[in-house]
Amino acid sequence: METPHCQRCGGRMEMRVRHGGLRPVCPGCGFVHFANPRVAAVVFLAEGERILLVKRKVAPEQGRWALAAGFVELGEAPEAAAIRELKEETGLDGVIERMLDLTFNEADKVIVILYQARAVGGILAGGDDVEEARWFTREELPELAFASTRRAVAAWLDGSLYSAASSRAGSSRNTSSRDSSG
């Protein structure tokens, strides 16, 4: 059990059947803890025939290249998280143009939202938890981290990334591959 004490009264949680499943419940105040998935916001930014990638400085996938991404913070809209992560990891200011994809990673219990963005300012430089941020052409692509990055780049390479977004609008896909933050 990941929540040993009640966040409301501090009492010891017990596993009980509630709302159709086995969940941590506080016998003192009746609070039920729901283990909800985390949400990751991922930014796909292309300029001409180049895409922006970041080299990860930390695990998971340390040393590999990925799209700028990170977890949505409490009270933050996913679009705002995407723009924040873009700035933190690349130094670039951006605007969201549209959502491209929505997937659920069953293994890590993460909802992954992929956004198309456009750079509107800033100076390209690696920051936060990345070693480097840089533009890559199709011919220069490095080894990629995360299934969501590999899917997005593959769709960009075959020309289906932007058309796929309109056909997937309102739908989501379930993935089981490891993809904890983008």
Regions found by a protein language model. Name each.
Residues E14-V17, L92-L100:
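A short coil-to-beta-strand element that immediately follows conserved catalytic motifs
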Residues T3, R23:
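Residues immediately within or flanking Cys/His clusters that coordinate Zn2+
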Residues N36, D101-L124, T149, L157:
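Active-site-adjacent beta-strand/loop module that shapes the phosphate/pyrophosphate-binding cleft
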Residues M15-G20, N36-V39:
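Short Cys/His-rich "knuckle" micro-motifs
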Residues A46-E88:
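Conserved Nudix-box catalytic region and its N-terminal flanking loop in Nudix hydrolases
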